[in-house]
């Protein structure tokens, strides 16, 4: 399968926006991406590290700690409210501008 034309930021944003609570764990984000794009089913470890790196590096993603009493691994990730419209008209191919918190 061919590599999708989307940046990692776009892939992460797609995953978060489709989730019911608009937040996902790293594993939830990776599950969405590999489920939607066959290209990412093969090279799992390498691109998962890129997803992790992009979550930590970009201000448009916000880490949300797990609530006490909710077992599981890892924090949740969501979009900073000010960055919700960073993709023009829902097109994930182009970002409007860099987002800074």
UniProtKB/Swiss-Prot annotation:
**Organism whose genome encodes this protein:** Rattus norvegicus
Q: Is Repeat included in the keywords of this UniProt record?
A: no
Q: Which residues bind DNA?
A: 2-93
The molecule here is called Forkhead box protein D4
Q: Which GO terms describe its cellular component?
A: nucleus
* Main location group: nucleus
Which SUPFAM superfamilies does this chain map to?
Winged helix' DNA-binding domain
Where found in the cell?
Nucleus
Give the top-rank taxon of the lineage listed in the UniProt record for this protein: Eukaryota
User: GO molecular-function annotation terms?
Assistant: DNA-binding transcription factor activity; sequence-specific DNA binding
Keywords associated with the record: DNA-binding, Nucleus, Transcription, Transcription regulation
